[in-house]
A protein has these predicted regions:
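Sequence/fold signature of self-assembling virion shell proteins
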Residues: 45-135
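Extended, solvent-exposed, turn-rich assembly/linker loops in the middle of proteins
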Residues: 1-57
Length: 135
């Protein structure tokens, strides 16, 4: 499935994804993860004066999550048992930079996200961007 290019159609696409989950027996509650562009567009768009975000909130009734690391969106169940997060036992600290007043360090840790049930999420790809016209 693909996110529509018109943000006002997001509720229809998300409703179709929810139907797809229900048809394969995946119960809710459900959440929607949106990439940065999709989330910003959803938060800023209204349909005849009513925020499109509120249309989506009525459909999902759980979290709508800003997920800048993804492109497009995912509609997934949060019922439990479908995903697993394994956090590594290694933590490292590193040096980034310094000034005369501060030192910038970072922490790094490994983790693995396991997708246990293939039907527990529906991906909505980003809409195709229009290609520039050749002159």
């Amino acid at each position: 499935m693909t996110l529509p290019s018109d943000v006002r159609e997001y509720p229809n696409a998300i409703a179709q994804a929810l139907s797809q989950l229900r048809l394969v027996g995946v119960n809710g509650p459900y959440s929607v993860l949106l990439g940065a562009d999709a989330y910003t567009a959803l938060a800023e768009t209204s349909d005849n004066g009513y925020p499109v975000l509120e249309h989506v909130q009525r459909l999902v009734k759980d979290q709508i999550i800003w997920a800048p690391a993804i492109a497009g969106a995912f509609v997934l169940t949060t019922r439990g048992g479908d995903f697993d997060l394994h956090i590594g036992q290694d933590v490292s600290i590193g040096y980034t930079s310094h000034t005369d007043a501060t030192v910038r360090l970072y922490l790094q840790e490994t983790f693995t996200f396991l997708y246990l049930t293939a039907e527990a999420a529906v991906a909505l790809a980003s809409p195709a961007k229009p290609k520039p016209k050749k002159t």
